[in-house]
Amino acid sequence: MALPWLQRVELLLFTAAFLCGALAAATLTRTQGSFGGNCPLYGVAALNGSSLALLGPSAPSLCYFVAGASGILALYCLLLLFFWVYSSCIEDSHRGSIGLRIALAISATAIFLILVSACILRFGTNSFCNSIISLNLTISCSEAQKTSWTPSGTAVQFYSNLHTAETSSWVNLILWCLALLLQAMQCKFKATSYQPQERGDQEWSSETDALVGHHQSHS
């Protein structure tokens, strides 16, 4: 059974959301790993001779939250895609009003989590970069990732990875907002499609009562 066109567009959005969420989670995890498991967001850099070092990292749970939220939502998108592909090929692909309400609640929660994660990435990266630039060793974060860090091998492409994670999160936010809009439209269409049926049932009931009453009066 073919899926409605609105739901097909919704699944395309979730496909893109899966890619964005997975990319954000992977790049942030890679950045945290390059700092030895420390979270550079809102961190403080310091000079160690002629090298840079992460002196005051944030709690690792901050990066875990951002990467975890992005990863879990990406996994949800992937499972949702598998479910609807299976349903459209094997079973009935109809989604009822209760399913739509649940989808709306999940989308609203996802939008909140992604918005919080994107803001953490934006302001956390800016705070860390400002602490680096204030040392007057480099003029930008993109240049700082080319500078030597202590310990050796630390901060490999950290700014590029953080920038990619942030951009992916903002794009992911837009995709989820569009998905929420499509789900709301499906709820509206489903509600309006029930009204003519209910009106028709009432007319049928009235006609039936009239016929029954007419038959009883003759008998």
Curated annotation (Swiss-Prot):
Q: Which residues carry this modification: Phosphoserine?
A: 206
From the record, what ranges are coiled-coil? none
Tell me which GO cellular component terms the UniProt record holds: membrane; nuclear speck; nucleolus
Record field: transmembrane: 9-29, 65-85, 98-118, 162-182
Q: Which UniProt keywords apply?
A: Membrane, Phosphoprotein, Transmembrane, Transmembrane helix
What is the disulfide pattern of this chain?
Answer: none
Where in or outside the cell? Answer: Membrane
Tell me the membrane topology, using the record's own terms: Multi-pass membrane protein
What is the similarity comment for this entry?
A: Belongs to the TMEM179 family.
What is the name listed in the Swiss-Prot or TrEMBL entry for this protein?
Transmembrane protein 179B
Which gene is annotated as encoding this protein in its UniProt record? Tmem179b
